[in-house]
Regions:
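Conserved FAD-binding catalytic core of PHBH/FMO-like flavoproteins
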Residues: 117, 121, 130-134, 139-280, ...
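Conserved mid-domain beta->alpha element of the FAD-binding
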Residues: 10-21, 25, 159-160, 192, ...
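C-terminal helical "tail/cap" subdomain of flavin- and related membrane-associated enzymes
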Residues: 3-5, 327-453
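Conserved Rossmann-like nucleotide-cofactor binding loop
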Residues: 15, 38, 165
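Acidic/histidine metal-binding catalytic segments
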Residues: 73-77, 259-276, 334-341, 350-355
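Generic enzyme active-site microenvironment
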Residues: 32-33, 127, 160, 300
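Glycine-rich FAD pyrophosphate-binding loop
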Residues: 24-46
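Conserved N-terminal helical subregion
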Residues: 2-6, 54-193, 250, 434, ...
């Protein structure tokens, strides 16, 4: 157990507020400094409204903090992807086998407020409208600015939970080489909205993530508890049509949607206005060679490993970070030992989910309406039934279990090879050579720890 029992967190977003809750509940003296105003007074001003997908990893962390009930009251179940092809009827592709294997759509702002209130209830002290300006790591002091004046404070250890543009990370980089690399995706995003239907009802199936896959671009729509959907258009920033360069305004967007997302047009009555009002967002993967400066500072969540949103795991991974760091701080007598153990545990897993998130983008936009993909998905579920302790579908390992991401990635790559070999040159499952496939599974996959008995 760390004997200092004092810690300072920079950032009261999702990860910062959850970590503050977990530590305060364990008796730590926690102070949190947040550059934005209190969202309970001024509304949420996070700059992003992409809905978040809450899966088992994130739910486990919320259970540890005792906030799962409050969060789930606001969540909307998503059973799978509702795929809207260019021609034809929408089709639901389930994430799992039944309603015990689902994910949940949650509003970022509402979730943040629940976690802030939990942190304060646990005894953490939160300071809003306080921007980190400078850190003196040698003297263990930092300066925050707010209300027109600067204030110098001391710290025992700092945790950076201040997002992809982390100010603390910038301060750390001035005194240590973090090996920072930012890989920008050539695709951006723009948000639109499907409002409630007549009588305040959902306009389309609420218990699904809707996706309009179109090759190198796509739309998705996630349900909100106020009967709206947040629609996100992903396509290249520039280049041949369609791109944000070739679809520059509302009129062009109306024509584009009429030709490429025709069934979505009547659902988005403010399409032109939304398109012109909302900015084009950028997407990137952040990697670092180190997340800490000995025992003085450590980074968590997006501040350490921002990722593209296409596996719905950014928040879930950040919440796993919070639990891992809280556990490490309880298990080690010194901050340096705790931060080192945390980094060693989480860094390879963050790298794995970053890789899988990029892979999932290609799957979502290119493959979900592909016949070979659907055949392999059907075989995947059958192999899960035939080998429940060996062959667990990729999505199940990532979203419904808490096995390390790195293990999920390793096994997923093996399983992809099994599926490709089994379906090569065939069009129907009745042509599968089951003896060969079963032997392939047994020879390449060991028993997976944590699978249901």
């Amino acid at each position: 157990m760390n004997t200092g029992r004092q810690i300072t967190i920079i950032g009261a977003g999702l990860a910062g507020a959850l970590l503050a809750t977990l530590l305060a509940q364990r008796g730590w003296r926690v102070e949190v400094f947040e550059r934005r105003g209190d969202p309970r007074l001024h509304g949420y001003a996070g700059g992003r409204s992409i809905n978040l997908a809450l899966a088992e990893r994130g739910l486990h962390a919320l259970r540890q903090a005792g906030t799962d009930d409050a969060v789930m009251r606001q969540a909307v179940m998503m059973r799978g992807r509702m795929v809207h092809p260019l021609d034809g009827q929408p089709e639901l592709q389930r994430y799992g086998r039944d309603d015990s294997e689902v994910i949940w759509s949650i509003n970022r702002g509402e979730l943040n407020i629940v976690l802030i209130e939990a942190a304060e209830a646990a005894g953490a002290t939160l300071h809003f409208d306080r921007r980190l300006e400078q850190v003196d790591f040698d003297r263990s002091t930092f300066v925050v600015k707010g209300d027109g004046h600067e204030e110098k404070r001391s710290f025992a250890a700092l945790v950076g939970a201040d997002g992809a543009g982390s100010t603390l990370r910038g301060q750390m980089a001035q005194v240590a080489d973090l090996g920072e690399r930012i890989d920008w995706l050539d695709h951006g995003y723009k948000e639109l909205e499907i409002p409630p239907g007549p009588g305040g009802s959902f306009r389309i199936e609420p218990n699904a993530l809707h996706i309009w896959p179109r090759g190198h671009y796509m739309c998705i729509a996630l349900p909100n508890d106020e009967r709206t959907f947040t629609v996100t258009l992903f396509m290249p920033h520039a280049g041949p049509h369609p791109s944000f360069e070739t679809v520059p305004d509302g009129d062009a967007a109306a024509d584009f949607f009429a030709s490429d997302f025709a069934d979505a047009v009547p659902l988005i009555p403010q399409l032109e206005a939304d398109y012109e009002r909302n900015p084009v967002g950028s997407l990137a993967t952040l990697t670092l060679d180190r997340w800490r400066i000995d025992g003085r500072a450590v980074l968590v969540g997006d501040a350490a490993h921002a990722m593209v949103p296409f596996h719905g795991q950014g928040m879930n991974c950040a919440f796993e970070d919070c639990v891992a760091l809280a556990d490490a701080l309880e298990s080690h007598d010194a901050f340096e030992a705790a931060f080192s153990a945390f980094e060693a545990e989480r860094m390879p897993n963050a790298a794995a989910i970053q890789h899988m998130a990029l892979e999932n983008y290609l799957e979502m936009r290119d493959r979900v309406d592909d016949a070979d993909y659907r055949l392999q998905r059907a075989l995947e579920l059958m192999l899960q039934d035939r080998h429940p302790h060996r062959f667990v579908p990729h999505y199940a390992m990532v979203s419904f279990m808490r096995i390390p991401y790195a293990v999920a990635l390793e096994r997923s790559e093996i399983q992809r090879g099994i599926l490709q070999r089994a379906t090569a040159g065939i069009e129907h499952l009745d042509a599968i050579d089951w003896a060969a496939v079963d032997a392939d599974v047994r020879s390449r996959l060991g028993l997976l720890e944590g699978t249901p008995a």
